[in-house]
């Protein structure tokens, strides 16, 4: 960012960090991919509101948390990326007379932190969030789940922000919620970018959620979290850059089983490989390009389709231009 942009930004009361031509590999868990034309790390929600209000009409915008389900293609992203992880990290707990309660968490809070906060406050049902490698915002956007739990099972209400910086409170009835899918009912458009449906007038992003949880035994919850994390460590390639599960599980089956049955475990292209530990993971073994990862995704989809007649659907958001 040059001095004139910095001066203009401060003149509008903005307090965050604006960067140009930012390598998105620094901000996604795959540690691969192209650059974004512009990124902004707001100081807080108020700062994000001001920044959105100042953007030109039609400017493509993406919100990114920990980047755990995201890949920016090597040709880069001609858009503005707003980072939520350091700005939207507030958490509050309110208890009810029956021992249950609610957790309010902003979109940039890591999902495992919410699981720990719930356990510390004797609230049950959020333990599975410890196994989701991303933020609450990302979990809301795709109804992330694991180990028998799904994010929207817990949601009492959410707060969203749109392109004009307008904040709204919405409840689950405003959305069609399914397996790894959340679509706002009123316009039948995705509430998040990345599904191929983009409309500047209707686009909204989650900035917080209120989760309603029953009373539980904190010690049991902590033991459950520990067991889930041990299970995750044993089954998943956590020591190398990855984006978690790459494909949704088809009805009645598992993507990992199908990919492994096609003999693709360990298959490598460039610096990326289908994990030898878990076939629904693609890992960066060193110097992977986004094109390597996408090629492996296409290979797995083609192989499973040809052998089983099943079309694997991606859980990963692919954005940007091919080089």
Enumerate the language-model features and the residues they cover.
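Structural signature of FAD isoalloxazine-binding scaffolds in flavoprotein oxidoreductases
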Residues: 33, 41-45, 71-89, 141-172, ...
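Glycine-centered flexibility sites
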Residues: 33-34, 65-67, 76-79, 108, ...
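Short, well-ordered alpha-helical segments in soluble proteins
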Residues: 118, 136, 140-144, 159-162, ...
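Anion-binding (especially nucleotide phosphate/pyrophosphate-binding) glycine-rich loop
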Residues: 2-136, 146
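A detector of low-complexity, intrinsically disordered, Ser/Thr/Gly/Pro/Ala-rich segments
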Residues: 1, 5-7, 195, 200
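Basic, gly/Ser/Thr/Pro-rich low-complexity segments located predominantly at protein N termini
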Residues: 38-39, 70-72, 113, 136-143, ...
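Hydrophobic, well-ordered secondary-structure segments
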Residues: 111, 115, 129, 133, ...
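Phosphate/pyrophosphate- and phosphate-bearing ligand-binding catalytic cores of soluble enzymes
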Residues: 18-20, 26-28, 32, 70, ...
